[in-house]
Amino acid sequence: MAKPEYYYGVHSVESLLELEPERVLTLFTLKGRDDQRLQKILELAEPFGISVQKASRDSLEKLAGLPFHQGVVAAVRPHPVLNEKDLDQLLQNNDQALLLALDQVTDPHNLGACIRTAAAMGIAAVIVPRDRSASLTPTARKVAAGGAEKVKFIQVTNLARTLAHIKAHFFVKVVGTMLDEKALPIQKYDFSGNVAIVMGAEDTGLRPITQSQCDQTVYIPMSGNLQSLNVSVAAGMALYEACRQRLG
């Protein structure tokens, strides 16, 4: 049996119990804690016969790997890792998929924030390269506040090759967010159909090999003197504009 993963934080554990309770092996709660938020978690766990163990603050910190566990940690059966084949399956019967691809975003806090926004916007999947990218660590899951259980997270071997593949086989329009001579203001782009919005890390932007797969680049107009936004903030603004258009 694979080693369990550990989820921590009230929102993350609540969402897991609501959506995938069968994955929860054991709940660890802080000794002496007895409040409404914890009671809700215990009520969600009870119908499934999930083992609940009281633990010290130090024990919870060791399980979570961080002190910011909010008094609850869940030992969880690992989720299967999704890959290129899962992305193909997702797109086979979908001609209105909206995807978010992150090019070497390495900060788990940024990844978690992007996933949270993607889940709120109803995005079909978040795609990242397997190497040199943040993965779904407990920190990313906590920041996602339940979003990681609501949106598909797909890791691919080569992001540029994957973008080329879904363009050729599923007619996905690849839109890069960067300011170059061909970039359109984001509100001028037509986000209908299958679309992948590609975001780069805020310090390095999109790699040239990723840029080469973009059918169009867009930028977010700003009136201030800032040259760039945090990637999770920019992702939220881009996804909002795409969803605004698609909802009519």
Curated annotation (Swiss-Prot):
Compartments, record wording: Cytoplasm
Transmembrane domains' residue ranges: none
EC number in record: 2.1.1.185
Residue sites binding S-adenosyl-L-methionine per the record: G200, I220, L229
Catalytic activity line of the entry: guanosine(2251) in 23S rRNA + S-adenosyl-L-methionine = 2'-O-methylguanosine(2251) in 23S rRNA + S-adenosyl-L-homocysteine + H(+)
Class of this enzyme: transferase
Family matches, as InterPro entries: 23S_rRNA_MeTrfase_RlmB, Alpha/beta_knot_MTases, Ribosomal_eL30-like_sf, rRNA_MeTrfase_TrmH, SpoU_MeTrfase, SpoU_subst-bd, tRNA_m1G_MTases_N
Keyword set includes RNA-binding: no
Recorded GO CC terms: cytosol
Signal peptide: none
Keyword terms: Cytoplasm, Methyltransferase, rRNA processing, S-adenosyl-L-methionine, Transferase
Highest taxon of source: Bacteria
GO terms, molecular function: RNA binding; rRNA (guanosine-2'-O-)-methyltransferase activity
Disulfide topology: none
Record flagged with keyword Thylakoid: no
PANTHER family given in the database record: 23S RRNA (GUANOSINE-2'-O-)-METHYLTRANSFERASE RLMB
Similarity comment: Belongs to the class IV-like SAM-binding methyltransferase superfamily. RNA methyltransferase TrmH family. RlmB subfamily.
Functional note: Specifically methylates the ribose of guanosine 2251 in 23S rRNA.
Name of the protein in question: 23S rRNA (guanosine-2'-O-)-methyltransferase RlmB
